[in-house]
Amino acid sequence: MNPQFIVYACPTGELAKQLETYWQLSREQCGANSAHNYMPHCTLTGFFYDRPDSASYYLQALEEAYKSAQNDLSLEIEIVNLVFNSDWHGLELQAQGVKELVRNFAQIETSPTRTEEIRLKDWLHLSLAYGFAPEKRSHLKQLAQKAIDVQANVGWELRFYQRANTVWECLRTWTL
């Protein structure tokens, strides 16, 4: 079976440390939820399948889109809000320049073996918790409010991942 590929923006710095602490505490105190299946990230594309040897096409296109964006766009990711809905907790994000970078990547990418379009994500967010038992909502909210400071120092990396079965491999990172 062909591997899946995906493009993420992942936090670094103090916020990343706070998110790791939250991940650990929420798992220990409330049990695993669907967010625990992934590292803290903002999804920029949907998963797409292609042959393992096609990764070079995507890496080349991302490199080209990144270099172009560095010259023309702001690649800042802004945390807009910490949100606690009944079935989803997370950070809502804004990043028009990053969205444009990924749109450019999808347009210039040339893999001859991919059979589906690369789906771009419009709603940018970082999930803290979802798929949790309703009775855990309040405790998860309290943990997040205590552990996460949305004003904390944060950097972001653009990352291209390959996932085969359950094994993730980051093939390349770029500093945003």
Spans of model-derived segments:
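Glycine-rich beta-strand-turn "strand-cap" elements at beta-sheet edges
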Residues: 81-87, 156-169
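Basic, often amphipathic N-terminal segments
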Residues: 1-76, 95-157, 167-176
